[in-house]
Structures are given as structure tokens and as C-alpha cells.
């Protein structure tokens, strides 16, 4: 299925989901039952359900039907991780997960663009690298919060989906350890809060410029700008994109916990370093 159409269909299902499910839990999302849909590969969805099964963030699930597609709704909370994150001075944005289906679509986009490796900066509970692994990409997550790293490893061991988890600060780790070719780097932070993180990572990558063969960055943008936002171009990332020498390959808007109750979704910008 064409990925832009898939993303739009996911947004339509999300809107129906929010109108059908009356819940006070901010962490809530759905996954279609694998055998009763034709949107995603059956095996991928079965694996994605195991991610939620072994993820202690989610403590409630129930069945519902969206556009004649049987689905499972998963609800939970991240308060314990918000409290835990206060231990770290260099956390610029609290953990709030990307939707599982959105993560799957993003990895499908990355694969369609020809990337073979992913590095997720601020990998949270590991859903992006989980999806990367089940789609055959070499997947590495960098997360400063040890509790979230422990959760990622538990999910990996329980589901038998393998990926690498690095517990560390993205501004101080050694980037020479990574395979910096055919690699897409995800920055899981909104424009205003992710600026320091992004420029810090960029300074490290500049040291290995000769190795950056087909390397890109995926940025989480915003359709809505705050009154005092420093950058109101290119979904909040215009200056960083220009300073970094990046070109935009694709922008796709997908549901996330950040925009759950808003009319517009979260735009994800897939970019590539210019030669």
C-alpha cells in the first residue's frame, strides 16, 4: 500500500478511535487485529502486539471495531518515567511515546528511502528500534534514562526482537562506534526543546563528515507554533536544516501522543545530508 495513503488512512482511523473511546488516559492507541485487516503485513502487526504485551506502560486493553476493522485498544501511563527523568540534567523533553503504528509507518518510509540502519536518539521505550528490527534494519537506540533502557531490554528479551540499546547522553557518546552510512537518525524531540540536542549531535557528526554516506535525520516537527517560537519555518526546523546542510526528502504527518487531541497530526521530516 502506498505510504502516504496508509498514513492518511491511519489518521482517519485515529479520529474514529478518539470519538469511539472515552478515556481519561492520555496514553492510548490502537492496533488492528492482524488477521482481520489488509493495511499492514500480518506478521508485522503480530510482532507489534507483542511489543504492547510486554510493555509495562500499558495496563489496560479492550477490543473495538474501527471502519469494520477489529482492533485492540491499549491504554496506560508514563508518570513514573516523567518523575524518573528529573534525575537527568540534560533531558530536554519528557518521554511521551510515538504511536506504535506511526513508528511502523516511519520505518517503512525509511526503508523505502533506501536506509539500512537506524539510530534513535531519545529512544524512550524502544518502539522505533523495535519496528526497525522487525523490518530487517540494524537498529540502535540511545537513551539517557536507565529505567527506560531497562524497559527496552526487557521488551527485547521477552519478544525475542533484537536491537541494541545504549544507555547514555547523546551529546557525550562516541559516534565513531556507529556505522555512518545508509543510516537514518531519528531525533525524538519537538523543535523548541530539541534544538540543543540536535545541534549537539550535529557537532559530533561533523567530525566524521567523510563517513556520512547516505546519512539522514528524521525530525519531529510541529504544525502549530508557539507565540515565542524561535523558528517558524519548515515545521520549526528551518534554521537547523539550513545550518546542517540537509535537504528534505519527505514529510509525513502521523498520530502521536503529542498531538492526540489536536486537529493536526505530528509532521515527521525525513532529511538527507547534501553531498
Regions found by a protein language model. Give the residues of each.
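Conserved SAM-binding loop of SAM-dependent methyltransferases across substrates and taxa
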Residues: 127-137
Amino acid at each position: 500500500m502506498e505510504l502516504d495513503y496508509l498514513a492518511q488512512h491511519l489518521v482517519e482511523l485515529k479520529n474514529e478511535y478518539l470519538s469511539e473511546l472515552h478515556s481519561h488516559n492520555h496514553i492510548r492507541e490502537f492496533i488492528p487485529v492482524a488477521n482481520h485487516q489488509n493495511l499492514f503485513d500480518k506478521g508485522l502487526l503480530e510482532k507489534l502486539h507483542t511489543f504492547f504485551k510486554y510493555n509495562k506502560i500499558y495496563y489496560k486493553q479492550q477490543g473495538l471495531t474501527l471502519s469494520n476493522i477489529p482492533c485492540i485498544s491499549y491504554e496506560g501511563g508514563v508518570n513514573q518515567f516523567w518523575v524518573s527523568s528529573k534525575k537527568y540534567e540534560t533531558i530536554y523533553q519528557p518521554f511521551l511515546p510515538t504511536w506504535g503504528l506511526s513508528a511502523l509507518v516511519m520505518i517503512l518510509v525509511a526503508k523505502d528511502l533506501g536506509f539500512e540502519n537506524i539510530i534513535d536518539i531519545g529512544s524512550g521505550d524502544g518502539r522505533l528500534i523495535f519496528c526497525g528490527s522487525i523490518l530487517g534494519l540494524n537498529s540502535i537506540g540511545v537513551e539517557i534514562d536507565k529505567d527506560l533502557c531497562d524497559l527496552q531490554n526487557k521488551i527485547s528479551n521477552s519478544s525475542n526482537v533484537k536491537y541494541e540499546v545504549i544507555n547514555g547522553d547523546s551529546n557525550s557518546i562516541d559516534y565513531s562506534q556507529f556505522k555512518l552510512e545508509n543510516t537514518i537518525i531519528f531525533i525524538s524531540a519537538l523543535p523548541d526543546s530539541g534544538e540543543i540536542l540536535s545541534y549537539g549531535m550535529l557537532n559530533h557528526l561533523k567530525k566524521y563528515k567523510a563517513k556520512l554516506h547516505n546519512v539522514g535525520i528524521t525530525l519531529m516537527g510541529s504544525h502549530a507554533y508557539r507565540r515565542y517560537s524561535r523558528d517558524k519555518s519548515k515545521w520549526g526546523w528551518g534554521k537547523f536544516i539550513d545550518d546542517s546542510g540537509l535537504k528534505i526528502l519527505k514529510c509525513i504527518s502521523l498520530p502521536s501522543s503529542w498531538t492526540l487531541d489536536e486537529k493536526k497530526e505530528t509532521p515527521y521530516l525525513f532529511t538527507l545530508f547534501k553531498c
